[in-house]
A protein has these predicted regions:
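Residues lining hydrophobic/aromatic ligand-binding pockets adjacent to catalytic sites
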Residues: 1-248
Length: 248
């Protein structure tokens, strides 16, 4: 049985794919393969950072933040045009740390997901642990949107995230194993390069992932586990270890 049944597409965070790009993917992927694409950041950042890539928009408020019409037209439509549906995994909305209150953020999510088509699946990844809680959980549950369990620098462990969430919120679950906890992106990158071996196992990450995947499976939830080389040094070897643990 193949280990690689899905992939996370990070490039779509910077620009949504065109229908022609998606059509080219169709010619390269197996029949039962699904792609989990990050949503264009134009939809997920309330204010543009003071970064050169934003040009004259740097530091300004983003009028397309949680704009359902923009998402449907600019992000979803190419998938429809390319007839990519059977290969479309959950769309991943990555929200960087921001200045919104829990109430503001959850209210925005609620109105946004209420307007989205129900024939696609959506998942939210937050980078601010303070957002985890009943209000966030309820909004996701109401719209069958998954929380992305992200093993990332400033987030709590996967087990603690689930403890705060209490239950899964959608008929599917998503895990992104990205960096060791409390380690910056650059430090994790330096540690992991050249990505050809396990440079340091993360036992808690592995154990939490296996336990939560088993729980999701016992509840008949489809599960997507996306692993970055920066987590342990070599994503395929991490995936192989997780699969072996799941088979025990």
């Amino acid at each position: 049985e193949p280990l690689f049944r899905t992939v996370g597409n990070d490039a779509t965070f910077y620009r949504p794919p065109t229908a022609s790009q998606l059509s080219r993917y169709l010619n390269q992927i197996p029949e039962d393969f699904e792609m989990c694409a990050k949503v264009w950041e134009e939809i997920t950042i309330p204010t543009y950072a003071t970064h050169a890539r934003y040009g004259i928009k740097a530091g300004q408020r983003n009028p397309n933040f949680l704009n359902a019409d923009a998402f449907i037209k600019l992000v979803l439509q190419p998938y429809r045009d390319a007839r990519f549906g059977p290969h479309t995994g959950p769309f991943l909305f990555e929200f960087q740390r921001h200045g919104l209150s829990v109430q503001e953020f959850c209210s925005g999510l609620d109105g946004f997901f209420a307007r989205l088509p129900k024939d696609f699946r959506y998942a939210v990844e937050i980078r601010n642990a303070g957002m985890l809680g009943p209000q966030y959980h309820e909004v996701l549950r109401r719209h069958d949107v998954a929380h992305v369990y992200n093993h990332w620098t400033f987030m709590p462990s996967l087990a603690e995230q689930h403890q705060r969430m209490r239950t899964f919120t959608a008929p599917f679950s998503v895990f992104r194993l990205q960096t060791p906890l409390r380690m910056t992106h650059e430090a994790a990158k330096t540690r992991a390069e050249p990505y050809n071996r396990i440079v340091g196992e993360l036992p808690e990450m592995r154990q939490d992932t296996v336990r939560l995947v088993r729980q999701a499976a016992s509840e008949n939830r489809t599960t997507y586990v996306l692993v970055n080389n920066r987590a342990e040094g070599n994503a395929p070897l991490t995936i192989q270890a997780l699969v072996e643990s799941l088979r025990e």
